[in-house]
Amino acid sequence: MNNQKYIRNFSIIAHIDHGKSTLADRLIEHCGGLNAREMSQQVLDSMDIEKERGITIKAQTVRLVYKAKNGNTYYLNLMDTPGHVDFSYEVSRSLAACEGSLLVVDSTQGVEAQTLANVYQAIANDHEIVPVLNKIDLAASEPEHVKKQIEDIIGIDASEAVLISAKNGIGIDSVLEAIINKLPSPKESSTDTLKALLVDSWYDPYLGVVILVRIIDGTLRKNMRVKMIGTNSVYTVEHVGFFTPKKHISDVLYAGEIGFFTASIKRVSDCKVGDTITDEKKSCEQALPGFKPNIPVVFCGFYPTDSAEFEHLKDSLAKLRLNDASFEYEMESSSALGVGFRCGFLGLLHLEIIQERLSREFNLDLITTAPSVIYKIYMLDGESLEIHNPADLPDLQKIASMEEPWIKATIMVPDEFIGTVLSLCKEKRGIQLDHSYISNRAKIVYKLPLNEIVYDFYDRLKSCSKGYASFEWQMDVYELSDLVNLRILVNGEVVDALSTIVHRSRAEQRGRALCVRLKDLIPRQQIDIAIQASVGNRIIARETIKALRKDVLSKCYGGDISRKRKLLEKQKAGKKKMRQYGNIEIPQSAFIAALQIGGE
């Protein structure tokens, strides 16, 4: 489409479960992107894991053709975005490729914490925002009340908000007309020189790397020689196209359009999300600003259960990194687990999803170590360090001070659950910053240590509020803290994979909980097994797995007592040798247990 006034690029932003993927389904259905036989729920949620969990993980794009009431045909490029805070990087990339957004709010629940986070990102990208109130067919729907909430909390005019029921297809025409009449078209191309933003990329086993682009200026054609400005790599374009949501091959993409191209790219490192793509012969003068990279805040180790799978894990992580630029990894080794990778994530759900994708898509069986965050260490000799692996923590005698990251959390909760939510935040060492009411819902702002959040905070928040509380957070500051390295010893040997950095006030509780759980998980041997938790040289918790007793006298039916004594002495000597040289095998379930002791 060469006339930009008939193009609209827009995102759908909303809190989890407010109906953005369902609305996307109805828009595709209404515009004839798929016929009735091909339609399925959550069309744009392409991964099985997305459909099973009912969440969007990857931002998806689709081109819709719509004949408006004014008689003109418009080309609508829709970017469906995730709602969970852990996938905010996906949201930011989608918003950078668009000029406007549909803000979908559940009219039975109102504005939630992650609605705020995503809408503020849209405002930062200078988006025109159209409020859409979903689920108006339900008896609990309160559209007028929610309109007032949007105006009071977000500060945008909601008087002309579109009322819809995405599930039943009510009001879809009104949404499409609002997109045409209220959202701006792309800016006119200022030059014929190709300038395109690399929005996303993924690996296709047949085509190599597939790149999703938003064309800012010029045109992208088949057989063009294009250059990635960030890496200076040059490729010949083989296929150009867009999604309807089926893959549709065309010969050209014009300014203002969103589409994909392939160029037999085999090196994953050449495709950096946010890079600028231009014509090799006639390069653009200035690169696009790209995206602000998201910094991982939660780290853990991935180790293959079979060491022969290491290379497969390495290749799999490279392919996933291409598809999800917000997680990072580097090689590390552990005396207990062998060689693996230290990986960084935007949150615990992000970690869980990556782990599940490695298992499903690449058939990998992994051991995952306990999650940790980045700590700042200041040494007595003036040196400063940043560590996220407890094994790298220097001797406490050489440390002058340590700082841990704190977050600013916004929690929206119905007023009947305020007491339990405040108790949970207090238990997690939280400091209350603000407490206000919007009708029957409370908005609580807390300052919380990230270390306390990465274990089980989200699950416990949902549990204590019966699923009604919503939670959004952002990094705040680093502050001095009394931190210690909690180490686990099995038969006197430190198991580095189970070490974790905790606040001194929580060390005994967490150490005791882990010792009790390991006692149930490690199989009994023919010797006593001591499981200990230590801070420095002090043992703070201990559990003992009692030995299995083998009856060596079972074959003796009487006779000289010296024969029995000889057998018992031999058994005693054998057990002494086992205590000295025996290795205790720790099952994988013990390492998984380390992820689940946060609230005990």
UniProtKB/Swiss-Prot annotation:
Q: Which GO terms describe its molecular function?
A: GTP binding; GTPase activity; guanosine tetraphosphate binding; ribosome binding; translation elongation factor activity
- Note whether Cell membrane occurs among the keywords: yes
Q: What does the entry give for GO biological process? A: positive regulation of translation
Taxonomically, the superkingdom here is Bacteria
PROSITE patterns from the xrefs? G_TR_1, G_TR_2
Gene Ontology cellular component terms for the protein in this record: plasma membrane
Which Gene3D superfamilies does the protein's record reference? 3.30.70.240, Elongation factor 4, C-terminal domain, Elongation Factor G (Translational Gtpase), domain 3, P-loop containing nucleotide triphosphate hydrolases, Translation factors
* UniProt-listed InterPro entries: EF-4, EFG_III/V, EFG_V-like, EFTu-like_2, G_TR_CS, LepA_C_sf, LepA_CTD, LepA_IV
Q: Which reaction does it catalyse?
A: GTP + H2O = GDP + phosphate + H(+)
Report the EC code(s) recorded for this entry: 3.6.5.n1
Which compartment or compartments is the protein found in? Cell inner membrane
| Residues that bind GTP | 17-22, 134-137
Keyword Nucleotide-binding included in the entry's annotation? yes
Q: Which family does it belong to?
A: Belongs to the TRAFAC class translation factor GTPase superfamily. Classic translation factor GTPase family. LepA subfamily.
Q: Provide the function of this protein.
A: Required for accurate and efficient protein synthesis under certain stress conditions. May act as a fidelity factor of the translation reaction, by catalyzing a one-codon backward translocation of tRNAs on improperly translocated ribosomes. Back-translocation proceeds from a post-translocation (POST) complex to a pre-translocation (PRE) complex, thus giving elongation factor G a second chance to translocate the tRNAs correctly. Binds to ribosomes in a GTP-dependent manner.
List the protein's name.
Elongation factor 4
